[in-house]
């Protein structure tokens, strides 16, 4: 059988799975019999050959039939068909991953448009809310603030030494659901599954991590099945000291590792990115990944409306870390088109729970002030739209139904093709649905959402609303990081990713309302995005590997394939 691909390991460290061209197979890791069947990385279930069964002590431990990978997949799909809810399907797939990693990824990658909504948005929201109640088996690492002073020792308990990416959260702001504490661990687990399923990043180098600093969610503290530390969150200073120790420990224990910050509270997300981005290889997906996929949607929309990014006037509903990340990346793209940073920021306004950001407000964080422009104070979004005259409206408020009919109609009066992105998730938090956007704009809106919605019919046309989901970006960036091992991660990499993604949207797809490529071909899409990002890494002299002659071929050489390998 074909062999699963892997990457060369530096400095003599050993991966948990055999190398791409290795022949020692299971013997190289000393697994036989039941131990082999209980290893999800090496388990082949019913696909072991007769020679493998004889050599590895498996005779009598598995059914007599030797099945192909396709037949195994058929059984999985049949069993999934008997599940009645997406949460049940999620639980089934998690159990599959715990038993047979190869078959899990073969399943997800066989039909990404079907399975991404199950293993991630929107099902992941319910899975996180019920995390302690559906918990089966430990995955990733749980690092408690009570271990402060001993973080390096804890990290050394992880069995894989060549970790390339740690995805880490403190559970402080999970999706649009707020503080979920340890329940938020579902997010790093799911994010890293998408690294592999969407961009082919080898899973053995990926580590989900939860930094447990407590929770202020009293309902969780009262839940007897809650899995986290039962105490309120610490002071900001105590938290940041803990994160400092964590970041330093990662650099020592996993020297080739990039830190992916995920779902921290808004002010912490902005502060921690600023604190570390020029010191270590790290990024924040909520800030940079969200900014990149939104910029990609804007670039695609401009293929319809004409014009450049620098000419757009943008209003955000929401002014937290996501809005700041989006605004910062869009402003950087405007600077690349010739504007000064100050002029680019002047094109972007924000509106939050207390109204329009303007200099007279005394409740603003420093990172919000570049987007507080001289305007009369206002708590009326429609009035702000009429005054500012934006070409694009972006919702990152986490509050559903806030793009009301008057809001959409105001945008439609100002623009022949208003660009309206309702990015909050999960589904019930979306600022408006595609049906509302198309109906209230009379079919004129160029719409995208943060979660997947079904097709919409309006005025005799069928619209396919695009999903501006970060999974178009962060797995590809993760693959580029995995392959090039950059010393730093820069905004230029995310801008390049946005252009590479938008370039793959066809005129026919734009005509149907799609602003992003179809999910059905997401691996090919993200390989091309990763190659573009890799070129930026090499052009910036940030890579720690030699530049290849062909970046796309280089990326493809690292892509994991969910195929069993020969073990004897």
Where are the model-predicted features located?
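N-terminal ligand-binding/catalytic initiation module
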Residues: 2-281, 536, 552, 558, ...
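Adenosine-phosphate binding glycine-rich loop
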Residues: 42-43, 285-289, 302-305, 418, ...
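Short acidic, glycine/serine/threonine-rich loops at helix termini
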Residues: 154-155, 176-187, 218-225, 269-275, ...
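Flexible, glycine/charged-enriched surface loops at secondary-structure junctions
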Residues: 206, 256-262, 308-312, 337-346, ...
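Glycine-rich phosphate/diphosphate-binding loop of Rossmann-like nucleotide-binding domains
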Residues: 279-280, 284-395, 544
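N-terminal Rossmann-like NAD(P) cofactor-binding subdomain of oxidoreductases
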Residues: 357-359, 376-378, 396-400, 407, ...
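Rossmann-fold NAD(P) dinucleotide-binding segment
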Residues: 380-389, 398-420
